């Protein structure tokens, strides 16, 4: 065990966390972790299976007197995000994670810690290794490649798991029980255009919106943050109605799962309108700044002269593009009827003028209800098809709708109250979890997701709040002790 982890409690959990942090396990490169899990099972004479995707399942029989209880699946993912500070010398495919204790926090030395979801893996291993914990039949499942596409959960075939209840150990706030997540899909539109000449004596300028807060397009979609792409589209729509405008370039947004922070377009208008468009831009900027005065305190608007461009997007395609960007839905579409949570949303993620005289627009839709996700994807698809674009809706991944009658939720809440004297928070998340895929492949599987407190995940600032590991460990043991008998 790492020197800094010798004294951490619970010892049985941190012993295994230290072990697996010596094993390189980048997403899509989990072979050594799979081999470790298989050897772990052999050494303890536990039944072990691996499916064709690389997911590993280890079964353990019930302790005496618990044989008639429902089978519980405990699930975590074996891969980790591999990020390091620029100055740090570290090879994620060879080196062991170096850890240190900072007060109540466990950190890594300039790299991701791997507690997402290594601490979940460690708790499963500690349970499989223990001889003094009461439980019914259990299946410990370790999925691969969660971080870069959920491919382990995607590839899992129905029947691989056989339990009645699933405890997902991949949440990041102790005291919170997650019972719902959104499914998602990407919708991409592609416009073809004919390059045209810009008339003589036209003023070329670049408009840019930047410095926005941004954030996750699911988790942060309810925080009233501005979308840079929609702001840009709004200005272009107004300018198109007033000026003889040519669109020469547009580069806006970025990742499909991020609220756009920056957007830029290069345009041309008659030279006589040069000063007028500057006034319009300033007035427009003031309006938008007032609208988002609370959430966008660092938003910046720029208009700069540009050198002349030889070509622009043909007028008809430019008009259809701008009008569609103005019209297409962005943000929350509906809220859940079961809890205070966004149910369905859409994000206008990126707009790119590319080589080959094409403009590519990427959007993403999310919902915890499959039919609602299809509906919002079709709304976006129809808007772009009306404008003559080719549109493709990706296969996507399913959501997980809250079950208000969930037995495992009731058990998790009551055992938490008995242990800690307070109510846990019951929440959903407007983002994807492996539970969404499990709910599709295993209809009727009763699930809840929870875990110890993590901060800075997916970054070298990742850290684990040590005392919460013991709390979650005790909660798991209490849940297992209270699992009901099979019907």
Predicted feature locations:
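Midchain, well-structured core segments that form catalytic/ion-binding scaffolds
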Residues: 104-107, 147-148, 154-366
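His/Asp/Glu-rich mid-to-C-terminal helical/loop segments that flank catalytic regions of hydrolases
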Residues: 225-242, 271-274, 319-324, 332-336, ...
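Zn-dependent metallopeptidase/amidohydrolase metal-coordination segment
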Residues: 5, 9-13, 343-359, 364, ...
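Active-site-adjacent substrate-binding region
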Residues: 220, 227, 234-250, 402-445
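Acidic, glycine-rich active-site loops and adjacent beta-strand->loop/helix elements
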Residues: 78-80, 141-149, 171-174, 213, ...
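Substrate-recognition/cap regions that form aromatic- and gly/pro-loop-enriched pockets
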Residues: 341-431
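Acidic/His- and Gly-rich active-site-bordering loop/insert found
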Residues: 3-105
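Active-site metal-coordination/substrate-binding segment of hydrolases
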Residues: 66-148, 153-164, 204, 318, ...
């Amino acid at each position: 065990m790492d020197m800094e982890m010798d004294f951490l409690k619970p010892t049985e959990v941190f012993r295994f966390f230290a072990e697996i942090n010596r094993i390189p396990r980048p997403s899509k490169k989990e072979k050594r972790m799979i081999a470790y899990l298989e050897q772990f099972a052999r050494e303890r004479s536990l039944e072990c299976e691996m499916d064709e995707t690389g997911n590993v399942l280890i079964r353990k029989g019930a302790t005496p007197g618990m044989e008639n209880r429902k089978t519980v699946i405990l699930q975590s993912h074996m891969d980790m995000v591999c990020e390091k500070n620029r100055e740090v010398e570290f090879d994620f495919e060879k080196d062991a994670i170096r850890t240190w204790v900072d007060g109540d926090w466990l950190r890594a030395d300039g790299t991701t810690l791997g507690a997402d979801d290594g601490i979940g893996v460690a708790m499963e291993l500690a349970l499989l290794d223990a001889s003094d914990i009461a439980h019914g039949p259990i299946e410990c499942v370790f999925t691969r490649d969660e971080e870069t596409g959920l491919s382990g959960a995607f590839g899992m075939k129905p029947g691989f798991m056989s339990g009645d209840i699933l405890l997902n150990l991949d949440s990041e706030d102790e005291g919170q029980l997650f019972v719902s997540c959104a499914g998602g899909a990407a919708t991409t539109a592609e416009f073809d255009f004919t390059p045209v000449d810009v008339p003589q004596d036209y003023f070329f300028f670049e408009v840019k919106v930047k410095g926005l807060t941004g954030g996750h397009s699911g988790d942060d979609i309810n925080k009233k943050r501005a979308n840079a792409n929609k702001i840009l589209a709004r200005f272009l729509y107004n300018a198109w109605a007033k000026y003889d405008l040519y669109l020469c370039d547009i580069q806006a947004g970025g990742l499909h799962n991020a609220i756009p922070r920056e957007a830029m377009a290069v345009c041309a208008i008659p030279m006589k309108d040069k000063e007028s468009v500057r006034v319009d831009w300033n007035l427009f900027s003031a309006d938008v700044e007032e609208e988002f005065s609370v959430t966008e305190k660092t938003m910046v608007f720029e208009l700069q002269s540009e050198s002349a461009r030889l070509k622009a997007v043909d007028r008809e395609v430019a008009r259809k593009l701008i009008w569609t960007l103005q019209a297409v839905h962005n943000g929350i579409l509906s809220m859940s009827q079961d809890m205070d949570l966004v149910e369905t949303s859409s994000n206008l993620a990126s707009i790119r003028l590319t080589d080959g005289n094409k403009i590519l627009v990427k959007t993403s839709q999310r919902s915890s209800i499959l039919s609602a996700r299809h509906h919002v994807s079709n709304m976006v698809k129809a808007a772009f098809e009306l404008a003559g674009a080719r549109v493709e809706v990706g296969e996507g991944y399913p959501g997980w709708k809250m079950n208000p009658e969930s037995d495992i939720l009731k058990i998790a809440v009551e055992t938490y109250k008995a242990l800690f004297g307070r109510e846990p928070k019951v929440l959903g998340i407007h983002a994807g979890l492996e539970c969404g895929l499990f709910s599709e492949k295993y209809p009727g599987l009763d699930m809840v997701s929870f875990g110890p407190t993590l901060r800075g995940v997916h970054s070298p600032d990742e850290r684990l709040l040590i005392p919460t590991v013991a709390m979650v460990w005790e909660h798991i043991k209490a849940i297992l002790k209270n699992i009901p008998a099979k019907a």
